[in-house]
A protein has these predicted regions:
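Conserved N-terminal beta1-alpha1 strand-loop-helix module at the mouth
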Residues: 1-67, 74, 84, 144-145, ...
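Small side chains
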Residues: 10, 157-159
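Conserved acetyl-CoA-binding loop of GNAT-fold acetyltransferases
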Residues: 18, 107, 154-157
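Conserved anion-binding
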Residues: 29, 44, 56, 62-149, ...
Length: 192
């Protein structure tokens, strides 16, 4: 997402009751987008950065006013730096060993990534051994029709990517996708 479209796209998501917006650091000018969103939404929405893979990024996103750091991997150094900077910290994990290491490092929640490679039965097995206070969020390949299975397995939420927004999408397309995810969440709540 670019700074030119970030406010309009994000407003469409907020209108659909999305309360957390993550700007991937591999986007064009991500720090500028984060600063714009923080200024625009103030405390109404949690603004964060995704694809956080180094210590320099932690400093940059904290200075930009982000409140959330999401990583594709589990790095003890990055988790500790993010926590020291006051950020909500969600590292990526794929195994129980990685999950326990990130919990010990101070992670606030865990990103099960890539979820395409970890079907709901894997999440259920992980939830059986991990502390119940730690939320697990499947990310990667999540679509509205997959939400119910993951929620039944114990998902505490989801990270949404290209099924919600891809470069070049219009605001209306993103709003339609947001509606589809909201419907998927309602269906999964009824199925529980």
């Amino acid at each position: 997402i670019t700074p030119a479209e970030v406010i309009e796209i994000s407003e469409a998501l907020v209108e659909k009751n999305f309360k957390i917006i993550e700007i991937p650091l591999n986007s064009p000018d991500p720090i500028e987008s984060i600063e714009m969103l923080v200024s625009h939404f103030k405390d109404e929405v949690i603004i964060g950065a995704g694809t956080v893979t180094d210590l320099t990024s932690i400093q940059l996103i904290a200075e930009a006013g982000a409140r959330l750091s999401v990583m594709p991997n589990g790095s003890i150094r990055i988790v500790k730096a993010a926590k020291a900077s006051g950020l909500i910290t969600i590292p990526g994990v794929f195994t129980p060993t990685e999950a326990f290491a990130m919990i010990e490092s101070g992670a606030d929640a865990l990103k099960l990534f890539p979820a395409e490679g970890a079907p709901p039965m894997v999440l259920k097995a992980m939830k059986a051994v991990l502390p119940t206070a730690i939320p697990i969020l499947p990310v990667g390949g999540i679509t509205p029709d997959k939400m119910a299975e993951y929620q039944k397995a114990g998902a505490n939420g989801f990270g949404l990517g290209s099924a919600l927004y891809k470069p070049g999408m219009t605001v209306d397309e993103v709003a339609e996708n947001a509606d589809a995810f909201n419907e998927g969440l309602k269906r999964s709540a009824r199925a529980l």
